[in-house]
């Protein structure tokens, strides 16, 4: 069987908007990674860039299950200051976009396409975003019956 390669005319990059209010971080990152790779399209090919643009709004209202909010640590050594460790609660106040971006980045493939796909991810703290002229489609994430705390 021959490898399917979509033609350049078949590669359309649609726009989706996801509301992150009370959505569990892992479920949000999984769905965003699927949309960024273009796996929701019938013309998907792993070697071709058929991904979509994803806008995530209300990033500051993301939910984490269990007691990860205080226990989990996000560490980054940006040099010259050295190692810096923040809990998710502190990082959610300062920079919630960074939490979501790193979760989505971990779910993308580790290759050259990942950078291009990650560049199509746009995360905003509030409900407003400047991409209304692109007419993004609303993407609903199905929630499990358990409540996120």
From Swiss-Prot:
A GO biological process held by the record: translation
Molecular function (Gene Ontology), one example: structural constituent of ribosome
Gene Ontology CC, one term: cytosolic large ribosomal subunit
Keyword Translocase: no
Keywords of the record: Ribonucleoprotein, Ribosomal protein
CDD domains (UniProt xref): Ribosomal_L13 (cd00392)
Record bears the keyword Ribosomal protein: yes
Pfam families attached to this UniProt entry: Ribosomal_L13
Spans traversing the lipid bilayer: none
Disulfide bonds: none
The protein's assembly and partners: Part of the 50S ribosomal subunit.
Function summary: This protein is one of the early assembly proteins of the 50S ribosomal subunit, although it is not seen to bind rRNA by itself. It is important during the early stages of 50S assembly.
Record PANTHER family: LARGE RIBOSOMAL SUBUNIT PROTEIN UL13M (PTHR11545:SF2), RIBOSOMAL PROTEIN L13 (PTHR11545)
Similarity remark: Belongs to the universal ribosomal protein uL13 family.
Designated name of the protein: Large ribosomal subunit protein uL13
Species of origin: Bifidobacterium longum (strain NCC 2705)
